[in-house]
């Protein structure tokens, strides 16, 4: 039997340095990753260090609203 709400949510992680600097002419876009998090274990916003292909380095990617 299924319990009301699922524990796992699909979340989108977005590069914080691309967003902070804005999308300039050198950067063609903003890096985004799609992943899952467990709502019971991680109730706060998720932040992970991932590789940004527009900044060419590892940066902090934070969870955004859909």
UniProtKB/Swiss-Prot annotation:
Keyword annotations: Chloroplast, Plastid, Ribonucleoprotein, Ribosomal protein
SUPFAM superfamilies linked to this entry: Zn-binding ribosomal proteins (SSF57829)
Pfam name, any one: Ribosomal_L33
Single GO MF annotation: structural constituent of ribosome
NCBIfam families for this protein: PRK00504.1, PRK00595.1, rpmG_bact
Family: Belongs to the bacterial ribosomal protein bL33 family.
The name this protein goes by in its record: Large ribosomal subunit protein bL33c
Organism per entry: Acorus calamus
Gene from which the chain derives: rpl33
